[in-house]
Curated annotation (Swiss-Prot):
GO molecular function, one term: adenine phosphoribosyltransferase activity
Chain's gene name: apt
Keyword Disulfide bond: no
Domain of life assignment: Bacteria
Matches recorded under PANTHER family: ADENINE PHOSPHORIBOSYLTRANSFERASE
Record GO biological process: adenine salvage; AMP salvage; purine ribonucleoside salvage
Pfam hit, one: Pribosyltran
The protein's annotated pathway: Purine metabolism; AMP biosynthesis via salvage pathway; AMP from adenine: step 1/1
Disulfide bridge map: none
Keywords from the UniProt entry: Cytoplasm, Glycosyltransferase, Purine salvage, Transferase
Catalytic reactions on record: AMP + diphosphate = 5-phospho-alpha-D-ribose 1-diphosphate + adenine
Function, as annotated: Catalyzes a salvage reaction resulting in the formation of AMP, that is energically less costly than de novo synthesis.
Protein name: Adenine phosphoribosyltransferase
């Protein structure tokens, strides 16, 4: 099963970025051509039927999966960045992380009203990053109903939080209770 192979490639780093966190290092997928290409293929298979207008990938690991997915789907890619990284006029949204707080920005002209946008990131934990991303896209008039991830940590409740704001999530693999 392709998802099982991808999960087997993901390395776990204990106590990173702080004590008590088991960090799932999705960059280990990038080192394995088969795992990386299979990840993109699985995301394409899942999301191609929805006919999205754009993929929004969150900094920075969301870029690594979101941009190739957008290319395969034949649509545009929106980089969702941390503050002061985008050159044109932006809108901003603050959010809570599993291990702190942060802010995200997108160009104010990145989404046209009515465009269907797929949000994509490497990992779903508490959902804070994706909620902030959804808020940014919706403030610009975009439609956000789906989010994709390589990894989900269901014990942290992110999927339920996304459902509360009308976003369905799909992950390639899950790490429960680990």
């Amino acid at each position: 099963m392709p998802a099982a192979y991808i999960k087997s490639v993901i390395k776990t780093v204990p106590d990173y970025p702080k004590p008590g966190i088991l960090f799932r290092d999705v960059t280990s997928i990038l080192e394995d051509h088969k795992a990386y290409t299979t990840s993109i293929e699985l995301l394409v298979k899942e999301f191609a039927p929805y006919n999205f207008d754009k993929v929004a990938g969150t900094e920075a690991r969301g870029f690594l999966f979101g941009a190739p997915l957008a290319i395969e789907l034949g649509i545009g890619f929106i980089p969702v960045r941390k503050p002061n990284k985008l050159p044109r006029k932006v809108i901003s949204e603050s959010y809570d992380l599993e291990y702190g707080t942060d802010c995200l920005e997108i160009h104010e002209d990145a989404v046209k009203p009515g465009e269907k946008v797929l949000m994509l990131d490497d990992l779903l934990a508490t959902g804070g990053t994706m909620i902030a991303t959804a808020n940014l896209i919706r403030r610009l008039g975009g439609i956000v109903e789906h989010a994709g991830f390589v990894i989900s940590l269901p014990d942290l409740g992110g999927e339920a939080k996304l459902q509360e704001i009308g976003v369905q999530s799909h992950s390639i693999c899950e790490f429960e209770g680990e």
